[in-house]
Amino acid sequence: YVKFVAYDPVLNRGRGYWEETLARNVSPGLNNSTMPHELANTGPTTFTFGPISYKARLTGDDNTNPQPSFVGKKINSTFFYSNRFGVLSEDNVIFGVANDTYNFFSRSALTQTDADPIDLNVSSVRPVRLSDVLPSPQGLLLFSERQQFQVYATDASILTPASAVIRTLSNYEMATNIPPVDIGTTSAFVSRVPGYSKLFTMALRDVEQSPVVVDISKAVLEWIPDTVDDLTVSPPNSVVMLVDRDTSYLYMYRFYNNGKEDLFQAWVKWELPGTIQTARIVNDAVTVVSQQEDEYTIGSIELDELPSGDAVATSSSFTGNVPLDMTTRPVKPNASTDAVVYDTANDITKIYVPYTPINDKDAVMLLTVPTADKGTDAELDSDQGYWAKATER
C-alpha cells in the first residue's frame, strides 16, 4: 500500500513520490490503555503511574505487517533485551523494534530489516505458559511452569528476525509465583512439591550442550516449607535468600566458589520479630519490611564479612552490625522531648524508640555505665506507650 506525496504540500499535486502507507480499514496499532503501563520516578519522593505512548502501525495490513501475537491475549511479563522491549504472552516471546522503544511494527511492509520486531513461539509438546525471563551471555532464558527455554542468535551476533531461534533447555517444574533470579554466572529458581520446596541452580554451557541443573537444597531435604513465596540474592556475597511472607522466617543459602566448584555450602534459618511483608538484598544489606502488631517497620543487616553497621557509638568505640531484631538508638519523640528522659516522680529513666514497643517481646538494653550503676531499671518508651521492664546486658 502506497500513497502519493507531492513535493508541493500546499497544492498537493505535480511532481512527487510514492510512500508506503497503511491499508484502509486496518487498525493503526495498539490500545495504550490495555497495554503495560509505566511507573516513572518524577522527583526525589514522587512517582507517576500512567499509560505508555506505543508507536502506531504506519504501513501494510494484517498480512504484510501483522499485529504482535499478544494482541487479544494476556501479557505475563515484560523486559528489555538487546536494545529491544520484550513481552511474554502465553507460549510466545515478542521483541519490539531495535532501538525504537515501544514499537512493535515493521517500518516497511515491503522489506525486512534486522531492526524489525521478532515474534517467536516455543513449540513444545506440552502446554506452555511463559512466565519469566533472565539474561545470560549465551542468550535469553525463558521460564515456564514445567519447561525452560533459551532464545539466541544462530550466527552468534545480534538478535534479528532471521537469526533468532528458541531451543528447549530442560524440563524442571518451577513455582511461577516466585520469579527466578540471577546469581552471577548461574540462575536459581524454586520448585514446589507437596509439603516442601526445592531450590535449583542452572548453569548454561555451549549452545549445543544441555545446562547443568543442581538441586542445592538436597542437603536440607523437606526443610524449606512449601509456603515460601519470594526469592532474593546477593551475587557478590554468594547469598540466596528465600522469603516466607506473613511468617517470621527467612531461609538463607550461602556458598563459596573458587571459580570451578563450590568449596563451602551452608543453610541458615532466621526468625525475626513480627511478620515479614517483603525482603530484599540491596548493596550488600538485607532490608526487611515487617509488621509489628499494628504498625510496619524497616530493618536491615549487612552481609559483608566485616560488619560496618553502627549500633552504638561510645567512648569505648563499641560498634556492631545493625540487626533485624529492632535494635535502635534512643530517638527524640518530638522536638521538645529528649531521647532519654529521667522521670523523677517514678525514679525511672525512659528511653524513647522510633516504634511502638512489642508486647510479647523482651527488650534488651546495651548500657555503657560504671559497674556501681548496674542493676538500675529503665523503661523503653514510645509515643504510644513503653515497656514495663527492660533487661540490661
Predicted regions located by residue number:
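Long, charge-dense tracts
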Residues: Y1-S69
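Predominantly extracellular/luminal cell-surface or secreted proteins
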Residues: V2-V5, E19-T21, G96-D100, V151, ...
